[in-house]
């Protein structure tokens, strides 16, 4: 018997009303995310990859967007198989942060600057699991330890501005995992970090995925990250899917010209020689 997808986008369309017209940001998107699988969604800015992801949690509605056509089926632990595009707001609110969590590319703008780390990490536990404060604190200390934050208990009374960018991203990951979600959406989670910290965060996400057994929807414009993280790849361009398939197939036998350009855009050591290489600046005396 075939395994049921955790998430199934079926001919999804997302439209944003603007002055005088309606802009179709996503058009006819269809793909699945299986339990325990990492699906990499890749494309340039404006391709519709983040809009598709935010449709899962109905976050686009805050900006006036609506879904005129299509479905988003989700295998919920508590609500059964439901269509998130048509579910009651209360159901989506219950799933948000509990069964589907999201981490973003700039944690400083996503963490509340006036709330302590303790307050922000315990909120989903109070809301979704009705935990007592003492039990919630013990759980978040354990989570901070799992995301490799040194002296986790000592960080609880600190605020986001006390932490480095890499530490803030680890706090975001801990918050996203607090209720042990079935799906983690990672929307460009390493873009604002330096290269060394990027590698650490990617390794951390992979380790935590294996530990929690969750699926990951990894959104990026970086094909090198996709090659490292994804089992399958969905390539988006101008709100549509132009190609999708297993990661090895996409990298070794890409069919669409846009996919080929994305792969060729990945820098390779020694790939630029002669006239193709950029001019070197003169040495400083």
Where are these regions (language model features)?
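A short, surface-exposed alpha-helical micro-motif characterized by mixed small hydrophobic
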Residues: 226-228
